Each structure stands twice: as structure tokens, then as C-alpha cells.
Amino acid sequence: MSTTPTLSHLDESGQIRMVDVGHKTDTDRVAIARGSVRMNATAYGLLTQPGQGKGEVLNTARVAAVLAAKRCAELIPLCHSLPLAFVGIDFELDEAAHSVHIRATCRTQYKTGVEMEAMTACSVAALTIYDMCKAADKGIVIEQIRLQYKAGGKSGEWRND
């Protein structure tokens, strides 16, 4: 017998609520989010020019992403505060598409997952790249921010390849 999907942050009367995770057992959890920042050739050239933008822009975006993951519960109203064990941010430069591909990985051992932390980290990394490159391209596009993988807890492993 299958269960009908529900919105977990709404009660029976449709009012918002924080999900009660007090009864759950701490388990190892991991989530990976991905996204991309696409820009024009000029901005991409400045970003990737040796001794120019790449190091500073991407390092700033990495630090911003880690901070965002740590503060996720302050930004997303019904998100639980949780102890992050790890936040990792990786960038892949895509010259053909003038894009930076972002991968945010978060881990914890807790009662609830780290999907929101990974998604927030990825989003803020993308926004930071946008902020630092917008002078060279007002038309920068942040795209495809999504959960790619999660594991742990009752729902187990999930992939979005």
C-alpha cells in the first residue's frame, strides 16, 4: 500500500509547523547539491585569468558557501539547526559553456537530513560568484540548483543523476 505524499511542514489544518524530529535516532546523513553560474566570454575570461579572479572569486564563494550552510536554519524558517560534521565546496570550470559548476557536500550525524544546508551552500556560492563578476556581465545566469544525492535516515539513499 503506497502513501499519498504530503507537505511535511503543514499540519492537518494547513498551518505551518516545524517537523518534530525529537523521537528520531541520530544517523549518518549526507547531501550533495549542484548548480551552475553561466556568464559571457568576457566575464569568464576575467574569472579564469591567472593571477586575476579565479583564486579570489572561487575562494570567496567557497567561504561564503560554508558560512551559508552553517547558518541555514537562520535563513530557512522551518529548517532545524543541526551539527554539521563537514561542508565541502568544489568548482569545475567549463570553458565551452563559460560556466562554473558548483558541487556542495554536507554531512552530519543527526535526526534530520542536510539537504537544505547543501542547497543553501550551493546557492550562496553561486550568488557570490554572481556578485563578484556582475561588473563584467549584468546577464549572468544562475541555473540548475538541485539536490543531486542524499543518504541516511528513514528514506535511505536517493539520486538525481
From Swiss-Prot:
Could you tell me which pathway this protein works in?
A: Cofactor biosynthesis; molybdopterin biosynthesis
Give the range the annotation lists for the signal sequence: none
A GO molecular function held by the record: cyclic pyranopterin monophosphate synthase activity
List the protein's name: Cyclic pyranopterin monophosphate synthase
Quaternary structure and interacting proteins, as annotated = Homohexamer; trimer of dimers.
- Primary role: Catalyzes the conversion of (8S)-3',8-cyclo-7,8-dihydroguanosine 5'-triphosphate to cyclic pyranopterin monophosphate (cPMP).
Binding site residues for substrate:
L78, C79, H80, M116, E117
Keyword Disulfide bond present in the record's keywords: the answer is: no
Which catalytic reaction applies to this protein?
(8S)-3',8-cyclo-7,8-dihydroguanosine 5'-triphosphate = cyclic pyranopterin phosphate + diphosphate
* Annotated gene: moaC
Among PANTHER family, the record links this protein to: CYCLIC PYRANOPTERIN MONOPHOSPHATE SYNTHASE (PTHR22960:SF29), MOLYBDOPTERIN COFACTOR SYNTHESIS PROTEIN A (PTHR22960)
Species name: Bordetella pertussis (strain Tohama I / ATCC BAA-589 / NCTC 13251)
